Amino acid sequence: MTQTLSQLENSGAFIERHIGPDAAQQQEMLNAVGAQSLNALTGQIVPKDIQLATPPQVGAPATEYAALAELKAIASRNKRFTSYIGIGYTAVQLPPVILRNMLENPGWYTAYTPYQPEVSQGRLEALLNFQQVTLDLTGLDMASASLLDEATAAAEAMAMAKRVSKLKNANRFFVASDVHPQTLDVVRTRAETFGFEVIVDDAQKVLDHQDVFGVLLQQVGTTGEIHDYTALISELKSRKIVVSVAADIMALVLLTAPGKQGADIVFGSAQRFGVPMGYGGPHAAFFAAKDEYKRSMPGRIIGVSKDAAGNTALRMAMQTREQHIRREKANSNICTSQVLLANIASLYAVYHGPVGLKRIANRIHRLTDILAAGLQQKGQKLRHAHYFDTLCVEVADKAGVLARAEAAEINLRSDILNAVGITLDETTTRENVMQLFSVLLGDNHGLDIDTLDKDVAHDSRSIQPAMLRDDEILTHPVFNRYHSETEMMRYMHSLERKDLALNQAMIPLGSCTMKLNAAAEMIPITWPEFAELHPFCPPEQAEGYQQMIAQLADWLVKLTGYDAVCMQPNSGAQGEYAGLLAIRHYHESRNEGHRDICLIPASAHGTNPASAHMAGMQVVVVACDKNGNIDLTDLRAKAEQAGDNLSCIMVTYPSTHGVYEETIREVCEIVHQFGGQVYLDGANMNAQVGITSPGFIGADVSHLNLHKTFCIPHGGGGPGMGPIGVKAHLAPFVPGHSVVQIEGMLTRQGAVSAAPFGSASILPISWMYIRMMGAEGLKKASQVAILNANYIASRLQDAFPVLYTGRDGRVAHECILDIRPLKEETGISELDIAKRLIDYGFHAPTMSFPVAGTLMVEPTESESKVELDRFIDAMLAIRAEIDQVKAGVWPLEDNPLVNAPHIQNELVAEWAHPYSREVAVFPAGVADKYWPTVKRLDDVYGDRNLFCSCVPISEYQ
């Protein structure tokens, strides 16, 4: 044997697991596109002046097992204290049936946002359940399918309040002084760019303030007090002030719904419904409003509609409110939400049902009553008489109490003057309460749980009678049926089977990077060392997190060519917002706050103009030339016209048209010449890593979609992560945090997310990916992504012309197929092709973006040549079907394309089509069949007959 031990150890084995085509397949594809090697191909495609001379120094690759062992050692540095800190985060019990069948199931976590409803009915149903939970608990009429976190939801509530306010000249937003501090932090950040004045005061003093358009109250205050705001809300409504209420989802099981008290908007975190704290996230926020405000709501809304056969079907409703359509006029810049986490919360509610949830909530409250009674019996004073799960305990020897707590590995809330906060949760036990007595009273307290239980069971006054819920919740059958594990497992599987995810087929969505989310990358997110930490625990308890985050940030700095990375943004859109705020504050620091014009190419993703608007900027569109590139003449003219008011340009690279623009450095130079900054959207970073970098190109700031390039799964529409990389001059202006000092970040800026490191518990996924790939693997991944896209483009060019190409007719990592000539010639549209692909077992490419009448295809590096050929064969077969329509063999109004997709029921129904059942459902020899459960949806019906709560169970059967 001639191999060395190093070769046998094969530290780069994961590279071959992650990259779909093996060496032989890569060579076949290189031959097909006319290139000798990967280096030769990328050398032809990527402009010479931006190619890196040396690879980023991120280390050698590691095996899956070595990387897991290394990360486990880092995770073990985290200390798992029992946290009673509260402030919007509590420990949970995630039911194992949900853990195994959803969180650890690629059928759920590798799906995409349900823009294609025919292949998304399962998660759409779970999201509809989430909306129903929200409606029942808040007492309002309309709910969204999740926002990024509670603090972001508060900022969205403020923006929405201004949109719907009848007090058009009012410009002040009132925040009650006992909202969570991180909520206030994010609200203040958003208010600054909108020009709102934020007033913080005791809620009962709100009427002392003039010119208020909206009010934010918190039903259970940050230190635990339950407020009955019925009379105050009534008075505010009489003055036409929009009222938003932050609520605790578990407390709402027992407390009066704020909507019943007159609130216009109610929101909060769904974290308590089964989602681990995870050092701050990811967590879904719930958001509800009155029906009259539905068209002003932010985020996704799931609606009930009909399919082509008249059957009930679900879809994302009222998308005309959203950034991908309305751009800078959108209600929000939200693109990613928190679908996977919302679905965990919704299934937590399904599994426990109303009876189970009431038992959990009552048990938490009972233990809190017992703790309160014992403390009061021993002379301790409580700040609040009315509470659900949180006590604010006045203590004479605060230092001594905190020292005993630390010795017992307990975290109490310590930032309250002369008091400590204690928040109990569903994991709290009798033993925990006895331990708390010892911490607060000493070991010789002499208290007995059972005796205290009898006392409070007969005389609990901690919830005001007027605040006790008197209506039933979760009466829909879906919440009252699946309570055995067998039934729950089957229900979840029935939902999963309705959807198309990466565990079944390639998802060739352009601008989405639906690559492999490897099992080894996913394993660490469920480790208790990562999952169970409170985001506001003392930093010495999170040394493992700090080390992991610091390493990941260092790698990202090297891969991007920037000087610093901020991990706080919870999504790409939020990263855009954070990056633009950094630019805004940088200009202000130089007394150039008047710079507010943001140049955006016409080809840009809708989040770009929406984020610019949210950051207080004016959007000026820059034209693209006939080749899809930024028109330099127009750019120079627009930059010169903006002059001293030019803030920045937002540009995507490679371009959204799927091309490496030759003039990208000149674009940066023009903007810098006029005093602007360059924001390079990181959406297409998968075609840069190891080959070039934003910093090397000349950009000043970028967000990175960790859920694209760096392997965090899309989760069916979230979670995402959008950390920003910045040059040194912008580093002081990245988001900070009011509760936790972010080590290494000398920033005084406000927060954009509730937690200091955003969705910290999914960062191990990207850490694992980079560690296992190493520098050589990361570059190769980019190169193979480019090869795969060019292979598809070259094979489909004759059937579906590629709209834009760069040098030598090449594309970057994605290509746009132009369907417009075919549509004009035959009447068959890009929509028909997209739906017909479902019959062939594929998710559609991106439709009509960035150019109407096109399909944008991004195969990623993870798809093998076998899968690419299967997709290509399907597209060529569809082209042959279009030719049949063109030839008159099938009429335009009745053919396999316009009737697609086809469902199983049609096999046994009467058949009157001019093509066979076999052609309909087993086209071109398709054997491994994915079956959609609904036919093409009627979008017009869905928006005209908006219905966003659960339908009768019979409709699903």
Curated annotation (Swiss-Prot):
Keywords (alphabetical) are:
Oxidoreductase, Pyridoxal phosphate
What this protein needs as a cofactor is: pyridoxal 5'-phosphate
The reaction(s) catalysed by this protein are: N(6)-[(R)-lipoyl]-L-lysyl-[glycine-cleavage complex H protein] + glycine + H(+) = N(6)-[(R)-S(8)-aminomethyldihydrolipoyl]-L-lysyl-[glycine-cleavage complex H protein] + CO2
Fetch the CDD domains from UniProt.
Answer: GDC-P
Q: Which GO terms describe its molecular function?
A: glycine binding; glycine dehydrogenase (decarboxylating) activity; pyridoxal phosphate binding
| Gene Ontology CC annotations of this record | cytosol; glycine cleavage complex
| Claim: Magnesium is one of the keywords in the record | no
- Single GO BP term: glycine decarboxylation via glycine cleavage system
EC numbers on record: 1.4.4.2
Q: Which residues carry this modification: N6-(pyridoxal phosphate)lysine?
A: K708
Q: Which Pfam families match?
A: GcvP2_C (PF21478), GDC-P (PF02347)
Q: How does it assemble?
A: The glycine cleavage system is composed of four proteins: P, T, L and H.
Name of protein: Glycine dehydrogenase (decarboxylating)
The species is Escherichia fergusonii (strain ATCC 35469 / DSM 13698 / CCUG 18766 / IAM 14443 / JCM 21226 / LMG 7866 / NBRC 102419 / NCTC 12128 / CDC 0568-73)
The gene designation is: gcvP
